[in-house]
Amino acid sequence: MVEIDLNKDGTGVITKISPRKNYLSRKAPKIKGASFRGERLEQIIAANIDQLFIVTSIKHPEFNNKVVDRFIVASESSSITCNIIINKIDLDDTKTSLKWKAIYQDIGYKVFLTSTLSRHGFESLSQSLKGKINLFWGHSGVGKSSLFNSLYPSLNLKVGLISSFNQKGKHTTVTNYLIKVEKDTYIIDTPGIREIDPYGIHRRDLGHYFKEFSEFTSGCKFSTCTHNHEPGCMVIEAVQSGKISEIRYNSYLRILETIEDDIIF
């Protein structure tokens, strides 16, 4: 983050550059110029963040816990406080959002159920933002811009539509924006993304970023246990006994399968 003094002609001079205390990143998208020797490079999303809000929707597009867990891994690996927003709950006829809220709250994450139609959850969400730099990150079409416009009507951000064919949103934000919304309160609006692969995560370390595993990993027979197939794995035993959510564990295995070693510069 930088501070600037504006000149009368609209130009500015940087007067201060804040030291970087943290940053959030992912593997760069699979596009030309975003790789080195065939390996995808690191793409920094934002720095000096107080907390992350993973924005999802219960429908249109459908809630995808495996994607949420990838966002969480990226956040945990950067030691950034992580929260989850499940938006569009006015479409949730079966109350599925309550099931997901329970799963993630039991682990220790704050979960906000929101609706821009009824303004459900807005008061508690607004209070959580105050006095902080808040990064909002999520798939295209989950309603980030609509949330911002409802929380802070003066923003008047562009809102996109959802494709009825593939349930994917269209990008309405094309770059990151740091927006001051109140005294000492900022939001970082990011473009909706189609894929999220955490950067710099090794197979042996992935379990550290599933915080419900921590109670059991010290009891594993092998110090290099990946909690996948090894005998004497206490994480697997905890899943089998219901102490760890099987849904979360299956998500862990899915991420484990896709991890490749990254080139670290």
Predicted features, each with a name:
Residues M1-G10, K16-I45, Q51, I80-C82, ...:
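Helix-rich effector regions associated with P-loop NTPase G domains
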Residues L41-D50, V55-G108:
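Phosphate-binding glycine-rich loops and their immediate beta-loop-alpha structural context
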Residues S57, I72-E76, D90, T96, ...:
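Signal for well-folded cores of large energy- and translation-related assemblies
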Residues N65-V68, T96-L98, N149, Y199-I201, ...:
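Short amphipathic alpha-helical segments
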Residues V67-R70, S124, S251:
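Well-ordered alpha-helical segments embedded in enzymatic catalytic cores
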Residues T81, D90-V142:
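Canonical P-loop GTPase G-domain recognition
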Residues S140, S145-S146, S150:
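Walker A/P-loop
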